[in-house]
A protein has these predicted regions:
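Surface-exposed binding patches on compact interaction domains or structured appendages
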Residues: 45-96
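A short beta-strand micro-motif common to beta-rich folds, especially ectodomain repeats
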Residues: 104-118
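C-terminal edge beta-strand
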Residues: 95, 118-131
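Positively charged n-region of N-terminal signal peptides that target proteins for export
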Residues: 1-5, 112
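Extracellular/luminal low-complexity segments enriched in Ser/Thr/Pro
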Residues: 93-108
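Short, solvent-exposed loop/linker segments at the N-terminal edge
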Residues: 39-44
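Sec-dependent N-terminal signal peptides
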Residues: 6-11
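Bacterial Sec-dependent N-terminal signal peptides
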Residues: 2, 13-38
Length: 131
């Protein structure tokens, strides 16, 4: 009886230790394959199209400025815009970014987040100040 108790306790502890994992949310493997981490624009209105190398099942999550976050709550949204920035998923492997003219005397910074499952990819967008 005592051996059975020890055996069951051992199996239970073994099961608990095996089932625990240290997976961190957002630390998935790169399934997007976008090599560009930073995009630089001059102060005038400008645009760029970026291409992904890997997956095509990603979606736009948010764009943010220093003080505002523009977030989507649907996987089907293809466009996010706000603060003078327009981001669109134009194809299965392409993302289009357009920025309005910077009329301030300060550099503008935006962050765009795209997501594929548990993997998040951040693109930093920097626009020069008006000269």
């Amino acid at each position: 009886m005592r051996q059975t108790y020890y055996f069951l306790s051992f199996v239970l502890l073994l099961f608990v230790f095996i089932s625990c994992s240290d997976d961190v949310v957002g630390k998935g493997t790169d399934t997007i394959g976008l090599e560009t981490k930073e995009v630089f624009f001059k102060s005038s209105k400008d645009s760029i199209e970026l291409r992904t190398r890997k997956g095509d099942d990603w979606w736009l999550t948010e764009i943010s400025t220093k003080d505002t976050i523009y977030r989507t709550h649907s996987l089907n949204v293809q466009v996010i815009e706000g603060g003078g920035l327009y981001v669109e998923k134009t194809g299965r492997k392409s993302i289009f970014i357009r920025i309005d003219s910077n009329l301030t005397g300060l550099e503008r910074r935006f962050t765009t987040v795209i997501q594929a499952g548990n993997y998040y990819y951040t693109i930093t967008i920097i626009q020069k100040a008006k000269e």
